[in-house]
Amino acid sequence: MDLIRKIEAQNKKNEAFVFNVGDTVRVVYKIIEGSNERLQSFEGIVISFQNKGIGKTFLIRKISSGIGVEKIFPVYSPIIEKVEVLRRGKVRRAKLYYMRNRIGKAAMKIKERLTIKKVKH
C-alpha cells in the first residue's frame, strides 16, 4: 500500500488549484493536434468533485447557445495549464446535479460567497 502512495505523491502536479463546488472557474488546457499545440479555455460552474486519489476529477457545466455543456477534467492532468477562479459560489451541497434541471438565467445562478480581507491600520 505504501508503494501506491509513493507513486501518487510523485505524480501529483496541480495541487495549487484551490476552488470548491459552486465556484465559477476558467480552465485553460492544451490541445495537441498532430504537431500543433494550442491553448483552449472552458468557463463554467464546478458542479462536482470525484475524489479518487490521483484520479481526482472535477465536473464543470456551462450553457452554450441554450444547451448545457459539461466537461470532466482530471485535477492532476498535465494538459491543464491553469485554473482561474472568476467567482466564489456559496452553496450547501457537495454535488450540484440539480443545476441540470434549471432553465434560462436560473441555470447559472448561484449566490456569491464574500471573502473578508484583513486590513492593518
Curated annotation (Swiss-Prot):
A GO-annotated cellular component = cytosolic large ribosomal subunit
| One Pfam assignment | Ribosomal_L19
Q: Does Cell membrane count among this protein's keywords? A: no
UniProt GO molecular function: structural constituent of ribosome
Q: Does the keyword Ribosomal protein apply?
A: yes
Membership in a protein family: Belongs to the bacterial ribosomal protein bL19 family.
Family annotation (NCBIfam families) = rplS_bact (TIGR01024)
**HAMAP family assigned:** Ribosomal_bL19
Q: What is this protein called?
A: Large ribosomal subunit protein bL19
The species this protein belongs to is: Borreliella burgdorferi (strain ATCC 35210 / DSM 4680 / CIP 102532 / B31)
